[in-house]
């Protein structure tokens, strides 16, 4: 049987095959076809219960949900999108919950979205360069410099002397070169970008990169050096074994297709026992004799003698490695240097100029905010004001001051439903640096009464000022070495709020 429609709806009105004019009909019926001229109350083609089943009529309107939500700390279009998405999901389901349940579901989704909004966090983990918490906090002067250029125009690419267009970051690059003991330096937007730029440049005509198998490391987030190199268009020529690589291994691998030798500093792990790898000086001599560029990726980017800070292990500096014969070095700006996320490359003036002429360089260059913060950080390092860099200040904080702060925090919590005491901790530099070094620290150890530790920990993370700590031996531990003294009051308030949070907020 072929069913032919005798009426159809256009722009809100029903048209009939028997009439050249729209025939609007208002009826007592319900559904999309209420005004169909074929019926006063129901459509024979689409029954009312099929078009608008009874279960769908209990779904609240978008406007009703928005009014019930009240004020939400999100842009209204984002809130509207979430509400519409949730209501659409209900329409596809088999059952529709009550209005209060629907409202709570929407609030839960909005809260999950809001928690991902970037904001300050109290770091009580004892990991100073915590990758998940943003690595190095900026020095106050660097933060001020960033804010100053963010709110105003700046001389990003103008020569204020003559008024013509000038070079980007020329002041920063000049001082970076001084800090690294190099002829020249430049900066891109992160450490991996620096390595990619170097590899793309040196393998444009000769595609092979010679690298030891013991240095094919994996960095944070599951990213692996071999994958990064291959994504750059290079072909890896692996030499040696995981624990044993000799200079002869490098020599035998070098050939007409060799574009560069790459040495990767194992900054996020260490090997001991039956291990061997040639020092930088020997690889540099071999590279010069073969006329092959030699690049060393330092990763963490120390610019000072780390062994003089709290008994840390030695971390090679850019100046040290260049002095040992490496052609170029690259490292991150937001680790031991204490600046913003950036990738720094230092070496001969001719090589740096060639890198900056690469078309790919423009895709990696930094904006004014990063340049302003990094410029101030480098200036402080050159001036010997490293004590103003937060991470270095943390490393040098004495135990007595940490104990004093812990006792004051405990005193402020005396009437709260918890057990709290001063504990011992072991802080780490983190961020893939100094893997063998730890620093004795002081913790505030909390047992939150009858509240489960996981619930207490989650409430702290979801509070107005999020607090991240660790659970060890049935205690929640907050390492004060990574908590700034200016955060102590907020820390106390966050702990109190977590203890008294209303049920259902978790």
Locations of regions flagged by a protein language model:
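Conserved C-terminal alpha-helix-loop-beta "cap" of PLP-dependent enzymes
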Residues: 403-486, 490-491
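Long amphipathic N-terminal alpha/beta scaffold segment
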Residues: 96-138, 142-145
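Conserved PLP-dependent catalytic core of the aminotransferase class-I/II
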Residues: 370-371, 375-430
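Long amphipathic alpha-helical segments
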Residues: 49-113, 117
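Short, positively charged low-complexity motifs
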Residues: 2-21, 25-32
């Amino acid at each position: 049987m072929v069913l032919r429609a005798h009426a159809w709806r256009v722009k809100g009105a029903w048209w009939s095959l028997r009439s050249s004019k729209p025939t609007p009909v208002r009826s007592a019926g319900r559904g999309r076809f209420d005004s169909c001229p074929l019926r006063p109350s129901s459509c024979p083609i689409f029954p009312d219960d099929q078009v608008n089943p009874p279960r769908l009529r209990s779904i609240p309107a978008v406007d009703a949900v928005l009014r019930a939500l009240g004020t939400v700390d999100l842009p209204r279009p984002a809130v509207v999108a979430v509400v519409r998405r949730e209501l659409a999901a209900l329409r596809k389901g088999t059952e529709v919950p009550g209005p209060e349940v629907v409202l709570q579901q929407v609030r839960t989704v909005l809260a999950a979205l809001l928690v991902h909004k970037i904001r300050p966090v109290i770091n009580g983990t004892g990991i100073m360069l915590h990758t998940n918490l943003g690595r190095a906090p900026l020095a106050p002067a660097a933060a001020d410099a960033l804010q100053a250029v963010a709110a105003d125009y700046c001389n990003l690419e103008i020569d204020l002397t003559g008024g013509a267009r000038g070079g980007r970051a020329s002041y920063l690059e000049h001082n970076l070169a001084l800090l690294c003991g190099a002829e020249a330096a430049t900066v891109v937007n992160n450490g991996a970008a620096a390595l990619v730029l170097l590899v793309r440049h040196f393998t444009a005509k000769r595609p092979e990169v010679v690298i030891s198998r013991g240095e094919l490391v994996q960095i944070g987030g599951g990213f692996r050096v071999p994958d990064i190199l291959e994504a750059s268009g290079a072909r890896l020529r692996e030499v040696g074994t995981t624990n044993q690589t000799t200079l002869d291994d490098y020599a035998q691998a070098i050939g007409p297709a060799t574009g560069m030798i790459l040495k990767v500093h194992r900054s996020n792990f260490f090997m001991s026992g039956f291990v061997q790898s040639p020092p930088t000086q020997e690889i540099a001599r071999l590279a010069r004799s073969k006329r092959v560029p030699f690049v060393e990726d330092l990763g963490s980017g120390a610019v000072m003698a780390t062994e003089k800070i709290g008994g840390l292990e030695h971390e090679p500096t850019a100046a040290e490695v260049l002095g040992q014969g490496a052609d170029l070095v690259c490292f991150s700006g937001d680790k031991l240097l204490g600046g913003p996320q950036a990738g720094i490359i230092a070496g001969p003036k001719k090589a740096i100029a060639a890198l900056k002429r690469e078309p790919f360089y423009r895709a990696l260059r930094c904006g004014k905010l990063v340049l302003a913060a990094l410029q101030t950080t480098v200036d402080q390092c050159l001036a010997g004001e490293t004590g103003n860099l937060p991470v270095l200040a943390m490393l040098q904080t004495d135990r007595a001051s940490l104990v004093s702060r812990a006792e004051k925090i405990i005193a402020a919590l005396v009437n709260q439903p918890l057990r709290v005491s001063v504990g011992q901790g072991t802080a780490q530099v983190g961020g893939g640096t100094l893997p063998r070094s730890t620093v004795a620290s002081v913790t505030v150890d909390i047992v939150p009464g009858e509240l489960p530790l996981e619930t207490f920990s989650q409430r702290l993370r979801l509070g107005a000022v999020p607090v991240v700590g660790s659970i060890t031996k049935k205690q929640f531990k907050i390492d004060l070495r990574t908590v700034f003294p200016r955060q102590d009051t907020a820390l106390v308030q966050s702990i109190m709020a977590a203890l008294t949070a209303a049920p259902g907020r978790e």
